[in-house]
Amino acid sequence: AGWRVAQWRVSVRDGELRAELLRQAIDISRTINPQRVKALSFSASDIEKPEFQRLCGQMRAYGRILEVRGIYSMAVREGAIVFGPESFEPGDPLANPPGTVYGEPSAAHWEVFRTGRPSTVGPYRDEFGSFISALAPVLDSRSGEMLMAIRIDVEEVQWRAAIRREQWVVAAVVLVLALMLVGGGLVLRHRDRLPAERQARVRFSEYHLVACLGLALTVVVAKALNDTEGQSDREVFRHLAESQAGRLAEAFRDLRDNQLDGLVRFFESSEHVDRWEFRRYAKAETRPPEVYAIAWAPRVCAQEKDAFEQSVRDQGIETFHVFEQGPDGVDRPAFGRDEYFPLLYLEPTEENPGAVGFDLVSDPTRKTAIHHAIQTKLSTATDLVMPFLRPGPAVVLYAPLLTLPTSVAEPHLARASVQEARGVLSIALRLDAILRRTAITGEGSSLFVVMDLYQLDVSQPPRFLGTSSPDNAEHADFARSGPGLSGKGLAGFFVSYPIFAFGKSYVVNVHPGAGFLAAHPVRIGWTAGLVGV
């Protein structure tokens, strides 16, 4: 019976781990921008492409917090499966240059490309070792075409170690019960050998043995029922968390496709963009509440700075000048750089007084993001920054403008090449606001789920960015918990989802809020325990 229970628990645990690994592969495939994949050829030439480098960096950062061997991407080219972006560092034995042919794919690998359905594979052996893998397709959102597959590997040794722990738990329980039976039998046998006058102290040994066995079995049954109830509650919460994470991911896609890209399209399609047209655009567009400013900052070379300042003054802003903040926080004229990115258009102006003219690259964090956006020609997010004249941290999204009509206010741009970035368009937002907007609440505004957002980096621990909890009271420290990052228990349970956006790798930990815990109290295990006692 103990062996059968152990095999059953192993089967259950194996299914749980496979489902969790597959969920992670699906989540990664969903967060990847299909447009970035379309830019790849899955050949050696990809290694120089910003899209390839960005995907590798995001996979690498996210793979660091997963207890897996690696994250790959694969595509079919000329009848063979080839590798693309992956999480491995250069020099890793499993690292493959883009376009490397997968030498020993199994039939199950090909089946994913044939059907376009996610699947788990293994254990199997290939040229890299023995693994259990999860594969999920990355689909074109418009045509439904399968662009590539995401593959997550766990080494078979690591997998079997996780499974073996379940066997040891069952074995320990069976051993304790067996020792109690053997010990009780020895006591009874010893009692029967004693003279009648010495048996008084052990006269009721049968009752004691039955009570101990009953108590032990009660504990085992109560624990099993508690685990079953907890697993049921966790499944309910997983569905809720998936919906919640989907809303957050959709909010990020809206920021990318509608808010930031829409601003870029507006500039690219206009023959003349002046301050008033920018203001009309800002007022006409529906802004989500987390976006507190949109802006345009032209690229101004040092030789043209004085002429640029004068041209803006001639347009009606008589006190305009390009400035920065000194170490003491006091404004001072910007100087000493080859180029400047001063805020020229900023909306809503009345909510951001005194910011026009601020040189964005005077701040190291903003400068890093702006230069990366220009070099890659891809939209890029900053790390957390302090907003100009606003309390609390924020994140700024930058998109390089590669085509811009020459306006009267910007004569210094007339001689620039059409291939160069004319400047950057930006959206400033508060991440805690986007988390709270997408949060699900119950009665009395109690949170059913709490979302904690972290930024991931290969060289640093996860950095906390914000939480949907209004007072941060329910914010939990970041933790790892096996493949898929799903914690155990219920109060300590959380589900993690990746978000690859604006060149960053984020992870959102979704855990039960007070509303969910109140609606799903753990009762059945305690009830069984009390009845058993």
Spans of model-derived segments:
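Membrane-interface helix-start motif
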Residues: 155-174, 197-201, 438, 511-532
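Extreme N-terminal signal-anchor transmembrane helix of membrane signaling/transducer proteins, especially
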Residues: 1-7, 169-189, 201-228, 527-532
